[in-house]
Amino acid sequence: MTTDHGLNINNLSMRFDLPNGGSVQALKNVNLHLKSGELMSVLGPSGCGKTTLLNIIAGFLAPTEGEIQLNGSTVTGPSAERGMVFQQGALFEWMSVRENVGFGPKMKGTPRGEIRETVDHLLDTVGLGDFKEKAVYELSGGMQQRVALARCLANGPDVILMDEPLGALDALTREKMQSLVLKLWKETGKTIILITHSVEEALLLGERLLVMAPRPGRIHREYRLPFADLGVDQDLREVKKHPEYAEKREEILSMIWDMEEEIMGRMEAQS
């Protein structure tokens, strides 16, 4: 893959050495290209390397083999070009909402007036304009994830990496956050990669959806889907009524179920 623009993952493999002298092949020969502005969800059974892949893209881990390039430059470590949103917001609880969102720009030496303007705009965008001076610990889980999204965007990343950011939320809050992610994707034009264990969420929040298989972690199948674009303008509950949604949901659930059964069979054979 030689395309300079976007995110390129080339022949990526990751092996973890174990204390007993053995090793675990977490990822093997992963190849992928994302154009700037694409929204991709990544799904698969536990142990398929989803989070490992995201951590390598973020620069938190160095791959055993292969490389990742963003806009033609090799990823060698963490960078403001790649923002991360975790399942738990990882916010500074002793700071106000405003201070959390403005922390990154402040560390970069951005002028105070520019920070205030950016923070105000982002908090209005995520629906927290009336909570700017609140302490983070006063907010609900869903509101904290909105702060985490705004804080990520404040750093101006080209790529937003989301590691199961909605997994701990109740159903109603989760649906509202899914709609917000789609809104931000369309308004900002950012490239977004979202890891999830939910087939439904992967379908709704991925114009491209990767299904990964385990042992070793690899890309098993890729789908191109219409639901994310539909969800920008429609209620997500209406999107779920789309006939192709039910068809793909059952297909992918069956695929992952078969993977889980295969894993259990291997474990029983080894015991």
What are these regions (language model features)?
Residues G66-P78:
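Conserved ABC transporter NBD signature motif
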Residues I160-D163:
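Catalytic Walker B motif of ABC-type/P-loop ATPase nucleotide-binding domains
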Residues L43-P45:
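The feature captures the beta-strand-to-loop junction immediately N-terminal to the Walker
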Residues L149:
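Hydrophobic anchor residue at the start of the ABC signature
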Residues R98-K106, R116, D120, R224:
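Short helical segment in ABC ATPase nucleotide-binding domains corresponding to the A-loop/adjacent helical element
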Residues G113-F131, K183:
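Conserved ABC ATPase "signature" region
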Residues K134-Y137, N155:
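Conserved signature/switch motifs of ABC ATPase nucleotide-binding domains
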Residues A58:
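Helix-to-loop junction immediately C-terminal to a conserved catalytic motif
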